[in-house]
Amino acid sequence: MIEKVPMTAGGYAALEVELKQRQSVDRPRIIEHIAEARSHGDLSENAEYHAAKEEQSHNEGRIAELEDKLARADIIDISKLSGDTIKFGATVTLIDEDTEKKAVWQIVGEPEADAKKGRISITSPLARALIGKKKGASVEVVAPGGAKAYEITKVEWR
């Protein structure tokens, strides 16, 4: 059975943009670099050629990965979600029970997770601890850095 990849419409669009960039801009540029390096003669000691081939391999691998994720995408329209129970797409405000620090996280699909932008993967330890909980609940998260306790102070749909 093909496993679906949950993501927001914005996450899907970002993957499409990256795929198009890699196919229509990066791929031709890399092919040009390979041709240019090839014209310099002996390929066995041609570092420029080997670097371009490695870049091509990396780019083609990422293209295949993007095509796979887009083909398996399960786009979830967050604007149609509501309620006070945390699930995919929720934006959750937490207070660290030890430090009293506030943190805001949106639960998104794996391909669009970016901690710097406040977006955590639905498969992360924190998201797994939050799913199904409501405002006012306390959760304990066991992560590689140790156990942390949080209080859920707000659940939003943005």
UniProtKB/Swiss-Prot annotation:
Domain of life: Bacteria
Matches recorded under Gene3D superfamilies: Transcription elongation factor, GreA/GreB, C-terminal domain (3.10.50.30), Transcription elongation factor, GreA/GreB, N-terminal domain (1.10.287.180)
GO terms of biological process kind: DNA-templated transcription elongation; regulation of DNA-templated transcription elongation
Xref: InterPro entries: GreA/GreB_C_sf (IPR036953), TF_GreA/GreB_CS (IPR018151), Tscrpt_elong_fac_GreA (IPR006359), Tscrpt_elong_fac_GreA/B (IPR028624), Tscrpt_elong_fac_GreA/B_C (IPR001437), Tscrpt_elong_fac_GreA/B_fam (IPR023459), Tscrpt_elong_fac_GreA/B_N (IPR022691), Tscrpt_elong_fac_GreA/B_N_sf (IPR036805)
Coiled-coil zones: 47-74
SUPFAM superfamilies: FKBP-like, GreA transcript cleavage protein, N-terminal domain
Molecular functions per Gene Ontology: DNA binding; RNA polymerase binding
The entry's keywords: Coiled coil, DNA-binding, Transcription, Transcription regulation
NCBIfam families membership: greA, PRK00226.1-2, PRK00226.1-4, PRK00226.1-5
Family the UniProt entry places it in: Belongs to the GreA/GreB family.
Function statement: Necessary for efficient RNA polymerase transcription elongation past template-encoded arresting sites. The arresting sites in DNA have the property of trapping a certain fraction of elongating RNA polymerases that pass through, resulting in locked ternary complexes. Cleavage of the nascent transcript by cleavage factors such as GreA or GreB allows the resumption of elongation from the new 3'terminus. GreA releases sequences of 2 to 3 nucleotides.
PANTHER family: TRANSCRIPTION ELONGATION FACTOR GREA
Protein's name in the database: Transcription elongation factor GreA
